[in-house]
UniProtKB/Swiss-Prot annotation:
Belongs to the intermediate filament family. GO terms for cellular component: cell cortex; cytoskeleton; intermediate filament; plasma membrane. It is found in: Cell membrane; Cytoplasm; Cytoplasm, Cytoskeleton; Cytoplasm, Cell cortex. The modification N-acetylserine is found at residue 2. Residues 104-415 form the IF rod domain. This is Phakinin. Residues 396-415 are annotated as: Tail. It is linked to Cataract 12, multiple types: An opacification of the crystalline lens of the eye that frequently results in visual impairment or blindness. Opacities vary in morphology, are often confined to a portion of the lens, and may be static or progressive. In general, the more posteriorly located and dense an opacity, the greater the impact on visual function. The opacities can be nuclear, sutural, stellate cortical, lamellar, cortical, nuclear embryonic, Y-sutural, punctate cortical, congenital or with juvenile- and adult-onset. The modification Phosphoserine is found at residues 26, 32, 35, 90.
């Protein structure tokens, strides 16, 4: 195969011409016109002031094959010296306008012209590289046709690349499923942790209601004891009042009539003496009766006053007893309402416990299922890892075979 020489004029002061050496090309398909019309990534990186590695790749690598070599033109083959690359780096850095150099339009225009010229030369070199790649591919295909085993090897490479791509996609799908399952488990855990404060608040409220019920029971017992003591005091006051009334009646009815037992004389003196004695007795009797009546009246007034005070006290006790009974009834109603509230809260707590138990059972079942799926996924991932290692081993073996084949081709070409 004949060699073609391309002379590249460098944008520096010293121009040089270097031969475009023959490079090894991979067995790629023909490059589309879009790769020729649009500037490649290497050109974009060169325009932005970034220096590529010593091997400058021209065109795009095929997406179907992972281990493709690609048509490559070295910096020496392109005829671009390191001095030009350093100048291009400094020029690319100078294109960033500083605040004090915004008016330097001439330098920017010169740099733009230099870049346009460089892009045109790179485009020409790409066309030359494409032609060389086509000729090299045709030459290698003709040799592979003569050897007779290149088609099977190429089919094996294509199937290996396809298997590796499918394995990568399947691994990504399994990773996505694992992340989705983990996110679902985290969501269930977060919901369970969010429900815990509500449950604790309900339990604290129920405990506070228990305390209120205990205090109400203690108050009820205290009021019942006070009512019993008031009833006993009222009974003792009633008995004392009856005893005082009976004693007063006895004092009023206790005056006994005196019997006259002296004989009546027949003489005037005896009659007068008898009348005088009788009169004295009547006077003394009247005086005693008047004193007794006065004393009885005083005692009656005192008893009436005491009775009035006792009646007032009894009325006050009746009012207090009525108020106490009203309070007891209200406390009983309150106790009944608290008991109803307690029963409702107990039912609610029972339902909440039942619901939480069901949720925990469901979560346990879900976690068990997820763990089983995770174990299956891990087993599949390990199997895929083994398959991937096997494919990588096959890929390395194929690369070694390709390298040996290229060495044979080089020896044939040199021979």
């Amino acid at each position: 195969m004949s060699e073609r020489r391309v002379v590249v004029d460098l944008p520096t002061s010293a121009s040089s011409s270097m031969p475009l050496q023959r490079r090894r090309a991979s067995f790629r398909g023909p490059r589309s016109s879009s790769s020729l019309e649009s500037p490649p990534a290497s050109r974009t990186n060169a325009m932005s002031g970034l220096v590529r590695a010593p091997g400058v790749y021209v065109g795009t690598a095929p997406s179907g094959c992972i281990g493709g070599l690609g048509a490559r033109v070295t910096r020496r083959a392109l005829g671009i010296s390191s001095v030009f690359l350093q100048g291009l780096r400094s020029s690319g850095l100078a294109t960033v306008p500083a605040p004090g150099l915004e008016r330097d339009h001439g330098a920017v225009e010169d740099l733009g012209g230099c870049l346009v010229e460089y892009m045109a030369k790179v485009h020409a070199l790409e066309q030359v590289s494409q032609e060389l790649e086509t000729q090299l591919r045709m030459h290698l295909e003709s040799k592979a046709t003569r050897s007779g085993n290149w088609g099977a090897l190429r089919a094996s490479w294509a199937s290996s690349c396809q298997q590796v791509g499918e394995a990568v996609l399947e691994n990504a799908r399994l990773m996505l499923q694992t992340e989705t399952i983990q996110a679902g488990a985290d969501d269930f855990k977060e919901r369970y942790e969010n429900e815990q404060p509500f449950r604790k608040a309900a339990e604290e409220e129920i405990n506070s209601l228990y305390k209120v019920i205990d205090e109400a029971n203690l108050t009820k017992m205290d009021l019942e004891s006070q009512i019993e003591s008031l009833k006993e005091e009222l009974g003792s006051l009633s008995r004392n009042y009856e005893e005082d009334v009976k004693l007063l009646h006895k004092q009023l009815a206790g005056c006994e009539l005196e019997q006259m037992d002296a004989p009546i004389g027949t003489g005037l003196d005896d009659i007068l003496e008898t009348i005088r004695i009788q009169w004295e007795r009547d006077v003394e009797k009247n005086r005693v009766e008047a004193g007794a009546l006065l004393q009885a009246k005083q005692q009656a007034e005192v008893a009436h006053m005491s009775q009035t005070q006792e009646e007032k006290l009894a009325a006050a006790l009746r009012v207090e007893l009525h108020n106490t009974s009203c309070q007891v009834q209200s406390l009983q109603a309150e106790t009944e309402s608290l008991r109803a509230l307690k029963r409702g809260l107990e039912n609610t707590l029972h339902d909440a416990k039942h619901w939480h138990d069901m949720e925990l059972q469901n979560l346990g079942a879900v976690v068990g299922r997820l763990e089983a799926e995770l174990r299956e996924i891990r087993a599949e991932a390990e199997q895929q890892q083994q398959e991937r290692a096997h494919l990588l081993a096959r890929k390395c073996q194929l690369q070694k075979d390709v390298a040996s084949y290229h060495a044979l081709l080089d020896r044939e070409e040199s021979g």
